[in-house]
């Protein structure tokens, strides 16, 4: 099965050929609905915007300027060198996602990440890893 164009995939612990858009949207909603996802309203809008833009095949359009004007309501003459709102909020969003996946999302089927250096999210299937302490000889 070929993967959908325009959707970046991150593979952990195995080969993933395709994650469905619907599965990713369900994971997005699961995160947004969770009381364990400690993000502000702005960070939630940011997260939802970048995921939906990526799923719509517009990952290449996700830039600091686009996020500043579409999510944070900055004017068309926005300058990220003098207004670091996007990078600051991206870092806070990354920390909120990390906390979510350490607590409520540790068993979620899909991990959504926003790697440092980009605002384009990646998606991967989480695979349970069996600990040696749970393996017994019979």
Q: Which sequence ranges carry the predicted segments?
A:
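Cytosolic linker/terminal segments flanking nucleotidyl-cyclase catalytic modules
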Residues: 2-15, 36-43, 53-138
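Short low-complexity stretches enriched in small and charged residues
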Residues: 2-4, 22-25
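Short, Lys/Arg-enriched N-terminal segment that forms or immediately precedes the first helix
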Residues: 24-35
